[in-house]
């Protein structure tokens, strides 16, 4: 199953000229719920004599801080990733297979923690070393390096597009320990929408193969 990551737009006055780390701090403090569309491009390292393999997928994303989020991959294959606050559910529609993992054991040093799970910057700093990164492609970037060396995540960069009245979370770049790079781009973001109470509930479909880890 594909790994994931996260997004959103934070409307906030006075962020023009601020660094990416400041934009990340404001976003975590002020955006408690969010909803958006996303496109994800995953590039695997090139093998000898071959071009890098590129896969593109798209779908929707919702979150409610802290610790609840949902990715719904719609193209090219249907997959759902749902964190309900206790359990992280991964559902592959084509395989009719569900994987359930204890959320507290898997989310600390992940892209999801950066955007959707952590309640504040201090919580992020417990698991990541955070810093401003150089501007690139017209965006301001915050860099996050996991403090734990046990996981597969090597680094994350969060890109913000800043203006006079708003800072928009525009991109998320993820590099894993195998050299695979994932870039998520976000659109149609809604800031602090009122999400239905059952948005993050998940019940394995009848007949699905359920694997608990």
UniProtKB/Swiss-Prot annotation:
Primary localization: periplasm
Any Gene Ontology CC annotation: periplasmic space
Signal peptide: 1-18
Disulfide bonds: none
Keywords (A to Z) from UniProt: Chaperone, Periplasm, Protein transport, Signal, Transport
Gene Ontology process terms (BP): lipoprotein localization to outer membrane; lipoprotein transport
Record InterPro entries: LolA/LolB/LppX, OM_lipoprot_carrier_LolA-like, OM_lipoprot_carrier_LolA_Pbac
Subcellular location per the Swiss-Prot or TrEMBL entry: Periplasm
Physiological role: Participates in the translocation of lipoproteins from the inner membrane to the outer membrane. Only forms a complex with a lipoprotein if the residue after the N-terminal Cys is not an aspartate (The Asp acts as a targeting signal to indicate that the lipoprotein should stay in the inner membrane).
Subunit structure: Monomer.
Record PANTHER family: OUTER-MEMBRANE LIPOPROTEIN CARRIER PROTEIN
Family: Belongs to the LolA family.
NCBIfam families tied to this protein: lolA
Protein name: Outer-membrane lipoprotein carrier protein
Organism: Albidiferax ferrireducens (strain ATCC BAA-621 / DSM 15236 / T118) (Rhodoferax ferrireducens)
Organism classification: Bacteria, Pseudomonadati, Pseudomonadota, Betaproteobacteria, Burkholderiales
Gene from which the chain derives: lolA
